[in-house]
Amino acid sequence: MASGNPYTLKWGIMATGGIAETFCKDLLCNPAIRGADDVRHEIVAVASSSSSKRAEEFLQRIDGAFDAKTYGSYPELVADPNVDIVYVATPHSHHFQNTMLALEAGKNVLCEKAFTVTAAQARKLVETAKAKKLFLMEAVWTRYFPLSIKIRELIAAGEIGTVFRTIADLSINANSEQGQALKFADSHRMVNPDLAGGATLDLGVYPLTWVFQTLYHLQPEEDKEAPTVVASSNKYTTGADENTAIICSFPRHNSIGIASTTMRADTDPEKDTIPAVRIQGSKGEIQVFFPTYRPLKYKVVKTNGEAQTVDCPIPGDPARKGSGHGMFWEADECARCLRDGKLESATLPWKESIVIMETMEEALRQGGVTYPELITTDVYDPKSPLNTGNQ
C-alpha cells in the first residue's frame, strides 16, 4: 500500500494520432482499477505538429484533460514548464529527432517503439539522456503487462526448466481484394519508406520483444550475450519489407529465438486459438496467445502431461465506459522510476533497447531494406522538418 499521497506525473503528448489517443485514454483511467495507489497521471499539454486546433480536437476524442494546454508545434510543447515527461507518439521515422528535441529541452521521455530507425540513433538518445540525467524509456508496453511479468517469473523459477527456444510471430492479413497489392496506400506509414514503414519496425518488434524478454533479458547481467542474427525479407513495391523472418542465436547460452512477421497472412485467423508465442524449455513450454502485442491468456504445458491455462484480462474503468487497453502499466512504470530517481527502467534497460535496435537494423540490412538519410541520420537538427512539421 502507498503511504501518503500518490506521486503525480504530468504528461505532455507529442502527436495526436491513434496510438496517442489510446495511450491518453489509459492515462485517464482511475489507477484503482489496476490496483495502483502509489502513482497517478495528469495530461497537462498536447501538441500537433500542424495546428493547435488538431490538439483541441484530440482532447474531445479522448474525452478528458480539457484543461490541458494545446499547441500547434512540438517546440512549444517541450518548452512548457508544467510538463514532467513527453510521450513521443509520432511515426518511427520521427522518433530520433523528436526525442532529441524533448531531451535537449530538459524533458524526460517515453518514446514509442520502434525506438528509432537505426542503432546509432538509439545510442545517441541514451548518451544524451545519461549526460543530462533525464529519464528515457522505449514504450514497449507489452513488457509491463502482469502477464509478461508472471511469465518472466515462471521462467526464472525454472517452471519449464532451461529455456532453449522461443518462437514468436505477429502477422496481419493486409492483402488488397484486388491484385497483389496490400490494402495500404503507398503513402501509408505501414509501407512508406519515408516514414520507416515495413513489417519489421512496426510489427516485428513485438515477436522480438518475446524473444528478448525470455532469452536475453533473463541472462545473468555479468554474462549478457547479444545475438548473432540471420534474417530474410521479401520487399513490397515501395521498398519496405512486407515479410521478414529473424533468427537470433545465443550460442553461449545454447538458446535460439525465431521472430517472424508478415503483412500477407494472419498469425491466427481465429484470433486466440493457437499460440502466437512458444517459449520452450527442458520441462515444458509456455504458450502465449494472440494478440502478440496485447495477450490476454497463456498456457503452461509440462512434459509430464500437466497443463494449465491462465486468463489475464485487462481491467476497464466503468466511469469511462469500460475503457482500459493496457498501456497504463508502462505509464505507471515511468511514474515510479521518476519518483524513485531512476533514469531507466530495469524491465527494459537502455542497453537492451539498443541491442534490439541493432538486431532489427541487421535484419533489415540482410533483407536489403534501406531508408532515406533524413530519417536515418544520428545528427540532431532542431530545425529538421521532422521537428517543425514543415515538409
UniProtKB/Swiss-Prot annotation:
Note the PANTHER family from the entry.
DIHYDRODIOL DEHYDROGENASE, PUTATIVE (AFU_ORTHOLOGUE AFUA_1G07520)-RELATED (PTHR22604:SF115), OXIDOREDUCTASES (PTHR22604)
Supply the source organism for this entry.
Hypocrea jecorina (strain ATCC 56765 / BCRC 32924 / NRRL 11460 / Rut C-30)
- What job does the chain carry out? NADP-dependent D-xylose dehydrogenase catalyzing the oxydation of D-xylose into D-xylonolactone. Also displays some, albeit lower activity with D-glucose, D-galactose and L-arabinose as substrate. Probably not involved in D-xylose degradation, as it has been shown that H.jecorina assimilates D-xylose via D-xylose reductase and xylitol dehydrogenase, and it is unable to grow on D-xylonic acid as sole carbon source. May play a role in the regeneration of NADP(+) in the presence of D-xylose.
Which reaction is recorded as catalysed by this protein?
D-xylose + NADP(+) = D-xylono-1,5-lactone + NADPH + H(+)
Enzyme Commission (EC) number: 1.1.1.179
Show the SUPFAM superfamilies listed in the entry.
Answer: Glyceraldehyde-3-phosphate dehydrogenase-like, C-terminal domain, NAD(P)-binding Rossmann-fold domains
Q: Which family does it belong to?
A: Belongs to the Gfo/Idh/MocA family.
- Give the InterPro entries listed for this entry: Gfo/Idh/MocA-like_OxRdtase_N (IPR000683), Gfo/Idh/MocA_domain (IPR050984), GFO_IDH_MocA-like_dom (IPR055170), NAD(P)-bd_dom_sf (IPR036291)
Q: What is this protein called?
A: D-xylose 1-dehydrogenase (NADP(+))
Pfam families from the entry? GFO_IDH_MocA, GFO_IDH_MocA_C3
Keywords in UniProt for this one? NADP, Oxidoreductase
**GO-annotated molecular function:** D-xylose 1-dehydrogenase (NADP+) activity; nucleotide binding
Domain of life the protein comes from: Eukaryota
